[in-house]
From Swiss-Prot:
Keyword Isomerase applies: no
The keyword S-adenosyl-L-methionine is assigned to this record: no
Upregulation: Expressed in the early phase of the viral replicative cycle.
This protein's name: Protein OPG034
Keywords recorded for this protein, A-Z: Early protein
Annotated organism of origin: Variola virus (isolate Human/India/Ind3/1967) (VARV)
Top-rank taxon: Viruses
Family under the similarity heading: Belongs to the orthopoxvirus OPG034 family.
One matching Pfam family: Poxv_Bcl-2-like
Length: 214
């Protein structure tokens, strides 16, 4: 039974006895509510993880802990009701992220952004900046978005659909905006795969440098 006491003690009580492999399993499988940069995957400690969870979810530590152990297939009892369909919350790191940093992959950023748009999750500062591309796409590509939606409704995918985005220095950001508008319709996974298919690694790198310079 998890007692409703100090959140730090609750979390540390259960994390401190985990093996390193189990702890890595938490990091890699709990992506619905945790985001760690490449650097943090190898350097984060249990204490740091606990402090971030407590800071970001002060009223939901029991729930977060229960989800962690469900991920690990460990049956535990809790003194709270865990909803069967929890509305995903912003990832720990991304909820407060206000700027792009070099150790964050652009693909991770875009993947989470599309998921947040599809699932109507509140956006952090950096995502709000990126969301301006979606708003711009709604105004600029209304007809094209309608055609893309018709294509998807007919075929169930956008594999052979050519995005109506002219190739210029704004190609990556405009592609993100266009696909973000479609994300609630086609799903964030298909929107993300279309982004990977359509935007080259070089264009992604250029766009990441642009984000880092702001």
């Amino acid at each position: 039974m998890i007692m409703s006491t100090d959140p730090n003690n609750i979390l540390m009580r259960y994390l401190k006895n985990l093996t390193d492999d189990k702890f890595k399993c938490i990091i890699h499988q709990s992506s619905d509510f945790l985001y760690l940069s490449d650097r943090d995957y190898t350097s984060i400690t249990k204490e740091t993880l606990v402090s971030e969870i407590v800071e970001e979810y002060p009223d939901d530590c029991n729930k977060i802990l229960a989800i962690i152990f469900l991920v690990l297939d460990k049956d535990i009892d809790v003194d709270i009701d865990i909803e069967t369909k929890l509305k995903p919350k912003p990832a720990v790191r991304y909820a407060i992220l206000d700027k792009m940093t070099k150790d964050i992959k652009l693909t991770d950023l875009v993947r989470h952004y599309f998921r947040y748009i599809e699932q109507d999750i509140p956006l952090g500062p950096l995502f709000k900046k990126i969301d301006s591309y979606r708003i711009r796409a709604i105004n600029k590509y209304s007809k094209e978005l309608g055609l893309a939606t018709e294509y998807f409704n007919k075929y169930g995918h956008l594999m052979f659909y050519t995005l109506p985005i002219p190739y210029n220095r704004f190609f990556c950001r405009n592609s993100i905006g266009f696909l973000a508008v479609l994300s609630p319709t086609i799903g964030h996974v298909k929107a993300f795969y279309k982004f990977i298919e359509y935007v080259s690694i070089d264009d992604r790198r250029k766009f990441k440098k642009e984000l880092m310079s702001k």
